[in-house]
Amino acid sequence: MLYSENDKRKHESYRIPLFGSEEESTSIPKYVLKKEPMEPRIAYQLVKDQLMDEGNARQNLATFCQTYMEKEAEILMAETLEKNAIDKSEYPQTAELENRCVNILADLWNAPKEMSYLGTSTVGSSEACMLGGLAMKFRWRNNAEKRGLDIQAKRPNLIISSGYQVCWEKFCVYWDVDMRVVPMDKEHLSLDVEKVFELVDEYTIGIVGILGITYTGKFDDIALLDEKVEAYNEANEHQLVIHIDGASGAMFTPFVNPELPWDFRLKNVVSINTSGHKYGLVYPGVGWILWKDKEYLPKELIFEVSYLGGSMPTMAINFSRSASQIIGQYYNFLRYGFEGYREIHEKTKKTALYLSKTVEKSGYFEIINDGSNLPIVCYKLKDDLDVEWTLYDLADQLLMKGWQVPAYPLPADLSDTIIQRFVCRADLGYNVAEEFAADFADALHNLEHARVLYHDKERNDSYGFTH
């Protein structure tokens, strides 16, 4: 083929190796928009290189979020990235898939057939918690006005354990609600139900029960809480309700412990949220919230939106977002079915129990959560242990092998207790877990045979957790 000078310039860029390009030999603008465009292959590589030192997401044992999906799911989600989940009239079949997901969850959570349950997808459990909190606040306000209570006399309040996820603090700040916290102690590493009612008054909008505390993986005793709430409701005109923050547990427990009473089978549990991108096995981010009956979602929170020629009811804080995660959730429901989810979660639980025993056998640690209810392994150094290293040192050692395993203080009254926790997800197979166990043993050996420079025994670093 013969080339002219123009042809040479036209095709020159394709003859230059990627790392011989002009863009790779100069510093790219980082905080202002660059003037000229560049080839897509170069832009791709530059962005990929910027992310290179973040580590392997599958070795991130700090996160609950799903880090693996099947290729078919990835293709399907990539093919639907452009669909706007809010455009119900434009994408009616996508809306139908969302509706099916809500119905599947209602069945999974034992919503009474005689009631009119309803629900919606969200960006994640944080948004779902906000919606659940708003519904409780508005319903409390409506009922308080009917009882003649002066709703301006003091702020409404929400009761939750100190193991709460930060979205609840945000909810209370954003919507002017007093958050009344039941502190955890060494005897109660979940909600102390007896102390709940020391905080209840006529301005209480509801109580949050947590099915899988982010710090430890433990469950609040929802059945006992429901029993106590029922006794309170029988004796008082003001009626309490329970919202379940099931960000982690609500997509795990129905498959591995279906007999555990925590869901809509309990009379006073009126709403539940969960994260599809945790044990729903979908990439971030998708969440869900369901109400047991329409009476628990005040009508003033439901908007009829006229959009692109259609009218639709909506209850959300976010608006435009891709429908791909909703479609990914439906794919998983269709692909796995009940037995598929059960098998996956049982294997994940088996992995957690194996790692828990590995940690315990080392002799250094006291197990706080062994992964039998939720596959979260949580532990602390034994109180009588005389070592020069801390859990923060252990976290640093594991990070050298690529494993991200956080160490952090427990909240509030237990802030002097430092714990470490790792999350077992579906993609942490038994063979990979064996590799982690070997690296864990090596890390302990290195710490025991290294000279550790003096530092404070434990530093009260704080870690934020998000849905």
From Swiss-Prot:
Needed cofactors: pyridoxal 5'-phosphate
TM annotation in the entry: none
Class of enzymatic activity (EC top level): lyase
Annotated CDD domains: DOPA_deC_like
GO biological process terms held by the UniProt record: glutamate catabolic process
GO molecular function: aromatic-L-amino-acid decarboxylase activity; glutamate decarboxylase activity; pyridoxal phosphate binding
Family matches, as InterPro entries: Glutamate_decarboxylase, PyrdxlP-dep_de-COase, PyrdxlP-dep_Trfase, PyrdxlP-dep_Trfase_major
Catalytic activity: L-glutamate + H(+) = 4-aminobutanoate + CO2
Single GO cellular component term: cytosol
A UniProt-annotated Pfam family: Pyridoxal_deC
EC number(s) stated in the UniProt entry for this protein: 4.1.1.15
Annotated NCBIfam families: Glu-decarb-GAD (TIGR01788)
Protein name as annotated: Probable glutamate decarboxylase gamma
Organism listed in the record: Listeria innocua serovar 6a (strain ATCC BAA-680 / CLIP 11262)
